[in-house]
Amino acid sequence: SVTVTPNNVNIPCNGCTTLTATVQGSVATTSYSVAPTAYTPYSFTGGTPILVNIDDTWSGVITLPFCFQFYGQTYTQCVIGSNAIVSFDLANANMYNTWPISAAIPTNTVGDMMNCIMGPWHDIDPGVAGSISWAIYGTAPCRAFVVSWNVVPMFSCNNLKLFRY
């Protein structure tokens, strides 16, 4: 079973566990619509490798080939964290990707959590196995910037119960 306390999540390494999440609140917008789509994932392999064999760090700055609108802001660059997080705060580039999370979420005070898209954002360890890469799929105006954390094990759970996002 998964054990959750205010500052810790313990996931067992001896079998499969299904994780679900409930999103609380959102920012209203007049320009986005949400609709269900069929599950057709992009490739988990290929792309441009980053953070090869490095745990708990942010990538260098990655320039997007298009403008990305996120909560009313326009971004053209990002950084990717080894713990399944993408940030538009370029001050994080090549820095420590904070773990553990010591602040409540949501927060307006912790830099790692500002202006970011979180996968599950948890402590995974690409220093042991797996890969992190990014790629652009599609053609304008329907392009996608895709980041893959492929078969990366959980930190301190190196028997390779793997994570793919």
Q: Where do the PLM segments sit?
A:
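Von Willebrand factor type D
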Residues: 28-165
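Proline- and Ser/Thr-rich low-complexity, intrinsically disordered segments
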Residues: 1-43
